[in-house]
UniProtKB/Swiss-Prot annotation:
Functional note: Plays an essential role in the assembly of succinate dehydrogenase (SDH), an enzyme complex (also referred to as respiratory complex II) that is a component of both the tricarboxylic acid (TCA) cycle and the mitochondrial electron transport chain, and which couples the oxidation of succinate to fumarate with the reduction of ubiquinone (coenzyme Q) to ubiquinol. Required for flavinylation (covalent attachment of FAD) of the flavoprotein subunit SDHA of the SDH catalytic dimer.
Alphabetic keyword roster: Chaperone, Mitochondrion, Transit peptide
Gene Ontology cellular-component terms listed: mitochondrial matrix; mitochondrion
Gene name per UniProt: SDHAF2
Record-level GO BP terms: mitochondrial electron transport, succinate to ubiquinone; mitochondrial respiratory chain complex II assembly; protein-FAD linkage; tricarboxylic acid cycle
Assembly and oligomerization: Interacts with SDHA within the SDH catalytic dimer.
Disulfide pairings: none
Transit peptide start-stop: 1-29
HAMAP family membership: SDHAF2
Subcellular location: Mitochondrion matrix
Protein name: Succinate dehydrogenase assembly factor 2, mitochondrial
The UniProt record lists the keyword Protease: no
SUPFAM superfamilies given in the database record: YgfY-like
Keyword presence, Isomerase: no
Amino acid sequence: MAMPTVFSTSSRMLALSRHSLLSPLLSVTSFRCFYRGDSPADSQKDLIEIPLPPWQERTDESIETKRARLLYESRKRGMLENCILLSLFAKEHLQHMTEKQLNLYDRLINEPSNDWDIYYWATEAKPAPEVFENEVMALLRDFAKNKNKEQRLRAPDLEYLFEKPR
């Protein structure tokens, strides 16, 4: 009969030690509040802004080189929303743009330091600065409205570049 007593004593000790190990963790995590996004009192003192070199228009490249560069830069944005929006826009409009329009598009996608700004301007969530209010921005805004209700889930394949012109 001593056996069950020893067994129950050791199991109680094991249960106690397990409880004492877990209880501090449970008490700490149950009272923590986690926030997502900015809080109203955020001073943003910990925010580091890396200065980018100012955008300069490239005057020494051919139209075809500029189109190829802008196609690449439209596809490789660093944020999925702009990769999809700008690469599909480039597929539809880049080949038909004049040199002036290419320069405006170049400035639009390369001068702003924050890609979210471009997205917000294109979707009309925020007003664009006056310098970007031009015919290319109007084309981009119209394209972003997706009036034809196309499915835009990813950037287009590059096979269209190798098709013969119609």
